[in-house]
C-alpha cells in the first residue's frame, strides 16, 4: 500500500452515501473513518427505487449479489390518473428494458440497502465506524483535517467528506448557504403487510396514481412480504426535519377527490411517517481544499426521479476514482470530482422539480400530460430515460472485464 493511502479520510455521515464512499475508497486501498451523529448506524425510511445506473455502481463495489437477493424486480412502471383511476402509461421493465440499459430496475427497503453497505464496510479492515458522534468543529489548516465532536473526541485524517445529508453541518463550513428550501410538498410514508393488501392490488409493479396536486405510490418490498405506500400532497406547512408522525385526517382530506382504489389503500394505514420535502438550487462548487461534499449534502433533490440514493452512490465511486488518479492530492481530487459531477447532479435536481409539477398537474395541463404520455411507445419512454440511466463513461471504464462479461451475457439472455 502506498503511504498516502494509509492516512485515513474522515467521512461525516453513515447513511447510504457515506458508507458507499467508505467502501469505494476501501476498494481502492484507501482507509477511512465514518463518523455518524445518530446513536446507531441504521437507516430510517421505507422503500427506494434503484435505476440501472445504481447497478453499474454496485458492480464497481461488488455488491450486486447481496442487493439482488433483497430486492424486488418489478414487471412494469405504471402511471394511473388519481381521479379517474384509468391507466395513463405503462413502461415494461423486463427483457427489453434490461437489454437497452444492460441493468435492471429494482425496488428495495432502504434499511436493507443500508445493511448491505454496512456489512461490507464492517468486513473491511480499512474502514472505521463510529456512531453517536455529532460533529461540532472542523480544522483544515494543519496539512490535514481534524474533526471535533460534541463528546470531545477528535478525528484526524488527510481529508474530509461531508455525507451528512440535507441538513449537512459540513456544507455550512464549505458553502454556508443556510437551511434547505421547502418545496411546498409533504410526503407521508408507510409499509403494509402484503396480507393487508387486497389481492387485486398485489402487483409486481412500481405503480402510482398521479394528480391533481397529489400522488400515491404503491410497490412491493422484501420479495413481496410488504408493500410500500408513499402519499404526497401540496402544502406550505413547514416542519424542520423529516421523521415525524403524520395525521391520517390531513391525508384523507387532501385525497378526498381521488378514485376509490386510492382512498381504500390510504384507509389501510393507521400510522404514517411524515416529512416536508426540501431541496436546494444546484451549485457547481462544493469543495474547499481538503473538504468536499457528497450526496444530499452536495446536491439535495426532490424524490420525483427516484435518484437521491443513486446519485450519492455514483458520487462515491467517482470520488474514489479521482482520489486514486490524483495520488492523494485531495484538493485536486475533490475539484476534479465536483467538475465531473455537478452538471449531471444539477440536471437531476432541476428535472426532479419539473417532474414534481408534471405529476401533480391540474386542469388542461393534466389532460395534456395524460394525452402525451398515453401516446408514447415503450421505446419512446426508454429513449427519454437514457440521459438518466446511462452511466457517465468515465465511471464505466473502471468496470472489470469479468463484470463486463457477466453483464453482456445477462443482457443477451
Q: Regions from the language model: what does each represent?
A:
Residues 2-9, 26, 51-193, 236-254, ...:
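Conserved N-terminal helical subregion
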Residues 299-300, 317-325, 360-413:
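C-terminal lid/capping helical subdomain adjacent to the catalytic/cofactor pocket in oxidative enzymes
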Residues 204-239, 244, 248-250, 255-256, ...:
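Active-site substrate-recognition segment that forms the wall
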Residues 69-72, 256-271, 330-335:
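Acidic/histidine metal-binding catalytic segments
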